Amino acid sequence: MNVPATRKDLMIVNMGPHHPSMHGVLRLIVTLDGEDVIDCEPILGYLHRGMEKIAENRTIIQYLPYVTRWDYLATMFTEAITVNGPEQLGNIQVPKRASYIRVIMLELSRIASHLLWLGPFMADIGAQTPFFYIFREREFIYDLFEAATGMRMMHNFFRIGGVAADLPHGWIDKCFDFCNYFFTRVVEYQKLITRNPIFLERVEGVGVVGGEEVINWGLSGPMLRASGIQWDLRQVDNYECYEEFDWEVQWQKEGDSLARYLVRIGEMMESIKIIQQALEGIPGGPYENLEIRCFGREKEPEWNDFEYRFIGKKPSPTFELPKQELYVRVEAPKGELGIFLIGDQNGFPWRWKIRPPGFINLQILPQLVKRMKLADIMTILGSIDIIMGEVDR
């Protein structure tokens, strides 16, 4: 009987791209020696839509619906960064009530994003059951979003100087009920997942990255805090009104996939604490600074000129961006989401540079998967938590 010779040459495997509703249009060219990963090359750009160039031809209000398509699972953060930049450039005061509403929406969005990370992450490593429990809780958050903003996703809720609408009657009580309910659910997840020996075998010691490495690579968010660095922009920058709440930065020192999971679980618990404090202390008053609406009003056309005769609808008042430059950032669920904004005394930004956390966190993937097994790629990639909408922009 002839035994076939053992194959000794390396094999190249393409992983992805998948549909955007699945893991996204990320393509990995993986070089394998048997099941050992020798090299991994991420190929990006399948979801590139030119978001930075679009911003240069839109006013901020016109651009707001676009930004929800970056990280389409945590849209409140992209809206927050879009209005925070012009607010800081123009020294616009945000009413206290609007700031509290923003914090509540941001933390609900953080929980929803972490839930939608946790469900598929567990399914990727072989645990299907938590997926259904997690989506049940996520639907409750989307019900709250729908009641307040009119949309379950892509909310278009933030405005320069405040928010688009006040909270409806009874919404605060419903949000309190959700917080009390969800707290018990997170405890259930920890019993179901954290102490599961099969889960621990798949994630413990997989994808380890040290504290010095994460700083050198410029990583942020749970990737940074899971490696022993206590850095959270909500405490460092004190944007909105986070300094008025009592909460703790979640961090671990191991730097592996398990540590990143524990950081995100802890962040969901802290988000509930912040929401409860904000609901209890939310002040009265206006939800939007209406004075800024009169900025940049167009001149009235003469009765006989071209605009009067041929342009039926006059342009709405726009906010003029001062001739300055500014970098503004928020702590998104996936890391530091930043905007480098250059104004030019115009309604349109001269430059709108996006710093997406997923794009920068993804850079370390080839280093983390080298000398690991093929099955560990999905564990490590899942623990990084990327959304291709913000990676490709």
UniProtKB/Swiss-Prot annotation:
Assembly and interaction partners: NDH is composed of at least 16 different subunits, 5 of which are encoded in the nucleus.
Keywords in alphabetical order: Chloroplast, Membrane, NAD, NADP, Plastid, Plastoquinone, Quinone, Thylakoid, Translocase, Transport
Family matches, as InterPro entries: NADH_Q_OxRdtase_suD, NADH_UbQ_OxRdtase_49kDa_CS, NDH1_su_D/H, NiFe-Hase_large
EC number: 7.1.1.-
Stored PROSITE patterns: COMPLEX1_49K
Pfam family, one: Complex1_49kDa
Catalysis: reaction(s): a plastoquinone + NADH + (n+1) H(+)(in) = a plastoquinol + NAD(+) + n H(+)(out); a plastoquinone + NADPH + (n+1) H(+)(in) = a plastoquinol + NADP(+) + n H(+)(out)
A biological process from GO: photosynthesis, light reaction
Lineage: Eukaryota, Viridiplantae, Streptophyta, Embryophyta, Tracheophyta
Protein name (Swiss-Prot/TrEMBL): NAD(P)H-quinone oxidoreductase subunit H, chloroplastic
Principal cellular location given in the protein's record: plastid
MF terms in GO: NAD binding; oxidoreductase activity, acting on NAD(P)H, quinone or similar compound as acceptor; quinone binding
Family in the record: Belongs to the complex I 49 kDa subunit family.
Membrane topology per record: Peripheral membrane protein
Function summary: NDH shuttles electrons from NAD(P)H:plastoquinone, via FMN and iron-sulfur (Fe-S) centers, to quinones in the photosynthetic chain and possibly in a chloroplast respiratory chain. The immediate electron acceptor for the enzyme in this species is believed to be plastoquinone. Couples the redox reaction to proton translocation, and thus conserves the redox energy in a proton gradient.
HAMAP family in the record: NDH1_NuoD
Record's subcellular location: Plastid, Chloroplast thylakoid membrane
One annotated Gene Ontology cellular component of this protein: chloroplast thylakoid membrane
